[in-house]
Amino acid sequence: MTEQNISLTIDGQAVTVPKETTILEAARSVGIDIPTLCWAENLTPVNVCRLCVVEADNSKALVPACSRACDAGSNIETSNERVTKNRRMVLELLDSANDLSQSEELQDLMANYEADSSRYSDNLAAHDEPKVEDDLFIRAYDRCVLCYKCVQACGEEAQFTFAIAIANRGFDARVSTEHDIPLPESACVYCGNCIGVCPTNALQFKTEFDLRSAANWRPEDQEVTETICSYCGVGCTLELHTQDNEIVKVTSPADHSVTSGHLCVKGRFGWEYVQAPVYKPPSAKQMDAAVDD
């Protein structure tokens, strides 16, 4: 072991990792999965969801694996009874206050941890109508779990637009534009990076929203094709999601070395021309026939 590496134990496994490696990174390096919600590989951890907490022998409180650096010689438990009970409670509280029906990942976690939110009052659940202010994406705040990822992507983590932020505090906290002005009047540049990191579909492509409303959204039938954006020379990788031979949304892989999953408005939304009717000029024969008439 060099001075730059440290050793610790995770779920009984000896692990050696570089110093400053987070517990989450160390666990995943040996195949141990820790659930996350507010964490993303292309964003800085903000420790707000508490879903990734684990038990460390050098801490009385459970610690967030996404941001807590490994300590040499420490013993980490990622799925004991205390940790499991805490994650179950977090999932139940989230489900009692939000519509998580469109998050396949959270639905799977609810099932895996046997979370049952019915023991909490359903009066906490919000039932707001989606905000539809343009043809690009919608905002459904009754699905928002305040993970903060959209605010990060809009701010200094990617776009540096700062069009949205967390407004108010406590039960009244929500994602909002400045002074709650309509999105088209805000500083938003419609890059859609907020949609790309949203884990619950609180921010959703308008195309997906329309197809879901028509009961025609079929992710199991969709194909994903990688290509390079042709609008400029940066070389962003695009993932074209197609259904019934039509593009329904565009994403970008978070591990892409050029943009880390972030795109501009052209890359994310400038694809409708692909499906526009193609103009076919009349042939010489058709033109001659028109003249004769």
Give the label of every model feature segment.
Residues 14, 163, 237-239:
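Short, surface-exposed charged micro-motifs
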Residues 221-254:
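Catalytic and ligand-binding motifs that coordinate phosphates/metal ions
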